[in-house]
Amino acid sequence: MGKEKVHINIVVIGHVDSGKSTTTGHLIYKLGGIDKRVIERFEKEAAEMNKRSFKYAWVLDKLKAERERGITIDIALWKFETSKYYCTVIDAPGHRDFIKNMITGTSQADCAVLIIDSTTGGFEAGISKDGQTREHALLAFTLGVKQMICCCNKMDATTPKYSKGRYEEIVKEVSSYLKKVGYNPDKIPFVPISGFEGDNMIERSTNLDWYKGPTLLDALDNINEPKRPSDKPLRLPLQDVYKIGGIGIVPVGRVETGVVKPGMLVTFAPTGLTTEVKSVEMHHEALTEALPGDNVGFNVKNVAVKDLKRGFVASNSKDDPAKEAANFTSQVIIMNHPGQIGNGYAPVLDCHTSHIAVKFAELITKIDRRSGKEIEKEPKFLKNGDAGMVKMIPTKPMVVETFAEYPPLGRFAVRDMRQTVAVGVIKSVEKKDPTGAKVTKAAAKKK
């Protein structure tokens, strides 16, 4: 068993009928961790319901249905392997929480797989102003998904079938759009596939012998290995805080950057409470250190439950410790707000694990969301489809960072009226020093 394969997260994006479920289902079916017995059960049910046509999509439909009914699906079902990577498919965008998940960073994707419907009419619907192809691509780029693979799907249903001309037309148009969003199309493989028939998914297809590039599986294998940010200073947003008899207080969260280890002095922002880490554990096993991506619990000394809350951020006291944000400037894209957003708007921001109302104190500029260039200074308002720079002031103590330095703490969703009305990334933060920050006895000894 040579070296462990690297884990990567893939997000599958594209218009509603582009064939995302079929394509993803196909990969999971052929390369994945779905038990053959489960597949046979699904196949039998599909046949009984005359659902032959849904060959692979129903694999996902069943998984989704079981998940939504609260049957916990073994997450291994959403995984598949290439020769180089273990791939996890994180929520495909049909899911209403997808945008929120993508932003709050429960799932940072390393690569986006954009599925395009190549059929007559299908492609045009997806790429049109109202189509989701553009919005998903823009979101992926804004949220820092640097790598992309583009699949020209349904090649078995073009006119004529497997049409090279149609493929070239699509590559040209999608490239020009992706370039406007900010991607470099020369670095994006455009793979003609049929998620349904299986052409160029895993094996090279004779139906598409004019195409000399990689299959989808090859393209996934060629993804650049993501750099995990373990060399950055520690940032660990708290998800929960437990009091465990005989042990004490155990904050729990995911290491986003840096490392945490026993004996380390940590400072919790926004309050500035400083203490020593006694032990770190993951899945009930003690660790000598936890790395980015690890969900851990760690035991801290001389701390009361009331001192820590979800949304607080643990950091290394001696290496750029996290602090409360007095205010910050963000680039936001308004996605679905029925009216106009002006100065004084105060929605809730979901950023890492915090969920805090923030005031839009000042609309600084309106920018062209395609080119990123400034269109207007101090606009009176922003409306659907607009992008702008906004100065924001939290209504309660909050910890955020710039997207450039600490990506998971620098992107957010703006929630209002029970939906995501905007998304954004933080460009700069003005921090304030904590007043009367408590240093525990254990920490004072270590200093």
From Swiss-Prot:
The modification N6,N6,N6-trimethyllysine is found at residues 79, 187, 306, 396. Residues 91-94 are annotated as: G3. Residues 14-21 are annotated as: G1. GTP binds at residues 14-21, 91-95, 153-156. Residues 70-74 are annotated as: G2. This is Elongation factor 1-alpha. It comes from Vicia faba. The modification N6,N6-dimethyllysine is found at residue 55. InterPro entries: EFTu-like_2, G_TR_CS, GTP-eEF1A_C, P-loop_NTPase, T_Tr_GTP-bd_dom, TRAFAC_GTPase_members, Transl_B-barrel_sf, Transl_elong_EF1A/Init_IF2_C.
